[in-house]
Design a protein with these regions (language model features):
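Non-catalytic alpha-helical scaffolds and adjoining flexible linkers that form interface surfaces
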Residues: 1-23, 27-252
Length: 252
């Protein structure tokens, strides 16, 4: 059985298939992550429309017998041209795409659909400095959808409120949780040290609306702390090395 259908989709990646064709990986709320074949050479108008990070209305022809999907048309709603004009924004979008693909959107297609599209929309209209903070929010929210966010409010050992802690705050890699200075074992060499500002930021991203969370400023040193911490976590939780993170030297 074969059928024509339409849906809204985000282009995650495009790769060559044969001499003139391409295999396109999409994300949609209805179908999740799926591949579709785009036929046509370099001069194809449709080929120009179906490019990474474009979002729009997609028409497909599904051949159930051959287990294949063919792209018949694509109406772009959002091009995100600003992403291609900035190296850091391009890197952020590439990271987003790789993470979504390698985790199969955590099986939470509608939630990741909203998060990924919101992230790409946001970095398109933001400054590079704003993008660096948006990148941190994106990872922490993604970890939340994975169901792996640890408690940022209380010490793992004594229950002290970390927001009001006047001492240092540590994340124990072995115990996978935050520990106050009084409970921290100095012999533990597998940890991240975070400022109270970093903890408050993570709490805000979890509890506040995206608009409210965007208004929270960060010092440069805190941004660096969180980048090192969150990229470690996402690599750990995905169970694989993300190539975009490995290639980030010179970009960040």
């Amino acid at each position: 059985m074969s059928r024509n259908s339409s849906l809204q989709a985000l282009v995650l990646s495009v790769r060559p298939f044969g001499e003139d064709n391409r295999i396109v990986k999409f994300l949609s709320k209805e179908k999740g992550i799926f591949d579709a074949v785009l036929y046509g050479g370099p001069k194809s108008k449709l080929r120009a429309y179906v490019s990474p990070y474009h979002f729009g209305n997609l028409w497909i022809y599904t051949d159930e017998t051959k287990h294949s999907i063919k792209i018949t048309d694509f109406e772009v709603i959002k091009y995100h041209p600003e992403i291609r004009d900035n190296l850091f924004k391009t890197w952020c979008a590439s990271f987003c795409s790789e993470l979504v693909i390698k985790t199969d959107a955590c099986g939470e297609y509608e939630k990741i659909w909203t998060l990924a599209n919101g992230f790409l929309d946001g970095i398109s209209v933001s400054s590079e400095d704003e993008c660096r903070i948006a990148f941190l929010r994106f990872i922490w929210r993604y970890i939340g959808i994975m169901g792996l966010q640890c408690d940022t409010e209380s010490c793992l050992h004594c229950g002290e409120n970390l927001t009001n802690s006047k001492g240092k705050i540590y994340f124990s890699i072995l115990e996978n949780g935050f520990i106050c200075e009084n409970c921290f074992n100095q012999s533990n060499d597998s940890f991240f040290e975070l400022s109270s500002e970093a903890i408050i930021f993570l709490q805000a991203v979890t509890l506040l609306s995206p608009k409210e969370a965007r208004s929270i400023p960060l010092h440069f040193s805190t941004t660096q702390q969180l980048h090192e911490f969150l990229t470690f976590l996402i690599n750990r939780y995905t169970g694989c090395k993300l190539k975009t993170l490995e290639m980030s030297s010179g970009i960040l």
